[in-house]
Amino acid sequence: MRINPTTSGPGVSALEKKNLGHIAQIIGPVLDVVFPPGKMPNIYNALVVKGRDTVSQQINVTCEVQQLLGNNRVRAVAMSATEGLMRGMEVIDTGAPLSVPVGGATLGRIFNVLGEPVDDLRPVDTGTTSPIHRSAPAFIQLDTKLSIFETGIKVVDLLAPYRRGGKIGLFGGAGVGKTVLIMELINNIAKAHGGVSVFGGVGERTREGNDLYMEMKESGVINEENIAESKVALVYGQMNEPPGARMRVGLTALTMAEYFRDVNEQDVLLFIDNIFRFVQAGSEVSALLGRMPSAVGYQPTLSTEMGTLQERITSTKEGSITSIQAVYVPADDLTDPAPATTFAHLDATTVLSRGLAAKGIYPAVDPLDSTSTMLQPQIVGEEHYETAQRVKQTLQRYKELQDIIAILGLDELSEEDRLTVARARKIERFLSQPFFVAEVFTGSPGKYVGLAETIRGFKLILSGELDSLPEQAFYLVGNIDEATAKATNLEMENNLKK
């Protein structure tokens, strides 16, 4: 571990100050820097530009070397705005990659891509820093235990369960509830699971980042009185930041999570919202560096960049990183190269459906499109597996019958199919659930439903014991007992109206 020249202010060592270059060209966030012969910085080294602009404002811009162009010239990408920079300005080669603070002191704090706190609290009390570029763990260090990670969300736990120490993708277009689902998972896991979390806000809205911070303070995930008791570290590189910052902020969050896994030997949760913005930032940087674009205008290095990030998110013998990543799907097209490349790395996919959101069923998780490698009888048990398969079969049959219903109506179906449709509609509504983080919108208190309760509820619906209950009794409730209580209340209300 070394002193971080990008976050330690004026303390750049005398040795590092010797390797000075100067700016030869500036094109937006990309700088060309000339160094003396034989003193070229390495790829990924951090360069620091210090000085004053034309109105004597202090400038402190950190860049990362991306290309060695020849003729003692390097091309670097800035991690912050380049306003005020001029040709000829002095550039310091720090001699190392970007390094960020790690350890317990990061909990309860908000950082930018450089590991600088941006929450207006005291400086981070740690001398321990770690470089954001490092190799993935060796094969021999990996741990391959299979166990379920309970989330308390019915549709997830039953039909596409998450793996402890696995990678999970939340896929969906704009406005179908990816961020709300991530916030609910953070809330549930912080309450039901003792480990720490790291949240990487990659290229998303600043307002959402602020809302998340406020909600975490309200729920006690971030403890304002005793910040060291907090359970989460936040790293933000928002939409308004240059592409260099958005491309590297995921690595900053991952580096903090790796320290908790490798040194503190903890189970860590890493949330990334949104992994598509990481790809998008890489595409912008690739174009700025003059690379020829690949399919649909994406960077030719898309698979390499994604693999470099994803292979570091893994479980070792020391601890685990369970990663939950929101994946924006451009124009709801799952074959787009960005979501398609992400699919290859995931253990479970939670696909959000615009059709379900339009029906008002939240979380709008598509029960037939969502998948998990964990849904096998030898892992989850026979009862869970059988229930999940029967739920999927019932919903699939309902989907097949929808065209017939639309043209001929329900009356033309056989008795058996009518029963299947009635149960499928109850299942569809029972897959909805009130969220803790959505209490302000729905007015309903949030519900955490254990896996055993979830399985019991769906078995009762499938067995036909609840066929007499109205389908609206199953909408936005927690466990099955709440549904039967709601049905009784609805019946009483109807009797009063009569």
Curated annotation (Swiss-Prot):
Highest taxon in the source lineage: Eukaryota
GO cellular component terms given for this protein: chloroplast thylakoid membrane; mitochondrion; proton-transporting ATP synthase complex
This protein's name: ATP synthase subunit beta, chloroplastic
Quaternary structure annotation from Swiss-Prot or TrEMBL: F-type ATPases have 2 components, CF(1) - the catalytic core - and CF(0) - the membrane proton channel. CF(1) has five subunits: alpha(3), beta(3), gamma(1), delta(1), epsilon(1). CF(0) has four main subunits: a(1), b(1), b'(1) and c(9-12).
GO MF annotations in UniProt: ATP binding; ATP hydrolysis activity; proton-transporting ATP synthase activity, rotational mechanism
Binding site for ATP: 172-179
Pfam families per UniProt: ATP-synt_ab, ATP-synt_ab_N, ATP-synt_VA_C
Function: Produces ATP from ADP in the presence of a proton gradient across the membrane. The catalytic sites are hosted primarily by the beta subunits.
Catalytic activity: ATP + H2O + 4 H(+)(in) = ADP + phosphate + 5 H(+)(out)
InterPro entries: AAA+_ATPase, ATP-synt_VA_C, ATP_synth_F1_bsu, ATPase_a/bsu_AS, ATPase_alpha/beta_chains, ATPase_F1/V1/A1_a/bsu_N, ATPase_F1/V1/A1_a/bsu_N_sf, ATPase_F1/V1/A1_a/bsu_nucl-bd
Topology of this chain in the membrane: Peripheral membrane protein
CDD domains cross-referenced by the UniProt entry: ATP-synt_F1_beta_C, ATP-synt_F1_beta_N, F1-ATPase_beta_CD
Family, per entry: Belongs to the ATPase alpha/beta chains family.
Keywords carried by this UniProt record: ATP synthesis, ATP-binding, CF(1), Chloroplast, Hydrogen ion transport, Ion transport, Membrane, Nucleotide-binding, Plastid, Thylakoid, Translocase, Transport
GO BP terms: proton motive force-driven mitochondrial ATP synthesis
Broad enzyme group: translocase
E.C. number(s) listed in UniProt: 7.1.2.2
Record localization: Plastid, Chloroplast thylakoid membrane
